[in-house]
Amino acid sequence: MASNSDLVRAVESFLGVSLGDSVSDSLLLIATTSAAVVVGLLVFLWKKSSDRSKEVKPVVVPRDLMMEEEEEVDVAAGKTKVTIFFGTQTGTAEGFAKALAEEIKARYEKAAVKVVDLDDYAADDDLYEEKLKKESLVFFMLATYGDGEPIDNAARFYKWFTEGKDERGIWLQKLTYGVFGLGNRQYEHFNKIGKVVDEELAEQGAKRLVAVGLGDDDQSIEDDFSAWKESLWSELDQLLRDEDDANTVSTPYTAAILEYRVVIHDPTAASTYDNHSTVANGNTEFDIHHPCRVNVAVQKELHKPESDRSCIHLEFDISGTSITYDTGDHVGVYAENCNETVEETGKLLGQNLDLFFSLHTDKDDGTSLGGSLLPPFPGPCSLRTALARYADLLNPPRKAALLALATHASEPSDERLKFLSSPQGKDEYSKWVVGSQRSLVEVMAEFPSAKPPLGVFFAAIAPRLQPRYYSISSSPRFAPQRVHVTCALVYGPTPTGRIHKGVCSTWMKNAIPSEKSQDCSSAPIFIRPSNFKLPVDHSIPIIMVGPGTGLAPFRGFLQERYALKEDGVQLGPALLFFGCRNRQMDFIYEDELKSFVEQGSLSELIVAFSREGAEKEYVQHKMMDKAAHLWSLISQGGYLYVCGDAKGMARDVHRTLHSIVQEQENVDSTKAEAIVKKLQMDGRYLRDVW
């Protein structure tokens, strides 16, 4: 047993104080007791910290562009500030914005170029006007999605800019601008956002530099962007060249192929990122950049065994998180590429999938590599993880990716890659890549000598894997701890004979729920708010049109109405037009829908079966059968909701609505168009389409 003096020395050492040479037993007791209390407190705090580390926190998904926190960056004397804004859904608009920035910097020494995510431009709506007044030359890269809506990171700016125009009047006389829109001509509201912003800028006093560019992703949006860029240079020469060299011809510009610096790490020092673990980041809300990893609680097949297709019902468990949602919202899901795709890509790259590495935007000496694109993942991880979670491997590659591949091809025959990426190879690219739906992996397999280093592959060839969005098929009143998803499996042959498997739907098809195994599947998710909402007044009639998985948000609506009715709320009439092929194969949620009718939350269920009778019957045919009743409900102030395929079903339903208005109101086509337009403007004709 230690002597008192030894114990005193130990206590002194622990407390970091001197107790003197003569210490009484009572003082020693106090000191040792204090030490014990301190030790106990430290152990308690460590344990609490350890427990807290298990709490659900956001997964950090790095942003392509990190905006400076400080205010306006000073522009050097003699320089002209050029700001390029982007609003992107899949990263294409952002890529175009950065490509434009690099070319402007290369062509014009006096240009001080900055690329800005519209969502980061102003922390508060009140700052938009103040900041825009300081701009002189701007460009907007704006994508349109769904039913002519702005994408997430441009929605706040778009709402502010278009809704407050009357108050501001003409105030942008000092601003010169250009707009390039990204859309798909197959959709009804082709490039609506780009067109509207272009028109509004002019109406609010700004000077249009060139005509709005209309990128069509149904063809070659890269060619559209290149053509629009070419129209810029003669105009920018007047603004960004000095008088003495205004007439000189610019040196032909060749875009540099971006590349990250790769650092190899010891695989035994596995990073937490390799497990895609949750990481604290200070955010109190989850969003596209800070999703939350949650478990799959339930997964089941909705089609009957007789069906040759598949539709999955999946439930994410959000208990213990701060995730909340409203009926009608969307959920974004970060899924993973399947093992088969990852293995094949690893072989094509000639790399070990267990390679543990990180990507960096600076050189060994700390200087910048020149690009502004941050790595697609935030820390060291294995190549297997990087390919599974962060690389888009199954979409057709862009032309810029083919050019990057070509620079690392060793076989003369692989020179074809350069041709495909060139203006001369436009038709061949459209046919061989886009028309044949060749994925990046397929293209790499066709040109096996092209083995780019990982720094080039992740910077210039494989885009970041984007989240997939689904209409939530539940109501928080009915399922507050769950987010339900209804997902059709994407599976089928491409023109090349390859079987295309949708990334997220395949993941959901193979997901293991917690009700079947503790080792269940999980995914990072976030909620995207939607304006697809039930009327605030629950007595207002509603008409819902949603064949197939278009039923998803209406299942949430009906759960909501079920809960409201159980609480004694008086409900207005509700009609649901649903469509499927055959009641014996793909009549999803059949029992639930019938129970909603029995309980009274659904007034009438009208189903169109397209493969049962001699003639195909679709929801629009059933709408015409019920034209008088349908229009009567709308005339009483009712709401019409449509969900599903934008290119086919939603367009047909829209035309049917026009026909119903003409017939029931006895008006011509122009007047019917005006009536339908007013329904949309009043928020009584809502569409959730893709």
From Swiss-Prot:
One of its GO terms (molecular function) is flavin adenine dinucleotide binding. GO terms for cellular component: cytosol; endoplasmic reticulum membrane. Residues 1-25 are lumenal. It is a single-pass membrane protein. InterPro entries: CysJ-like_FAD-binding, FAD-bd_FR_type, Flavdoxin-like, Flavodoxin/NO_synth, Flavoprot_Pyr_Nucl_cyt_Rdtase, Flavoprotein-like_sf, FNR_nucleotide-bd, NADPH_Cyt_P450_Rdtase_alpha. Keywords: Endoplasmic reticulum, FAD, Flavoprotein, FMN, Glycoprotein, Membrane, NADP, Oxidoreductase, Transmembrane, Transmembrane helix. Its EC number is 1.6.2.4. Disulfide bonds: none annotated. Residues 82-233 form the Flavodoxin-like domain. Binds 1 FAD per monomer. This is NADPH--cytochrome P450 reductase. The lineage of its organism: Eukaryota, Viridiplantae, Streptophyta, Embryophyta, Tracheophyta.
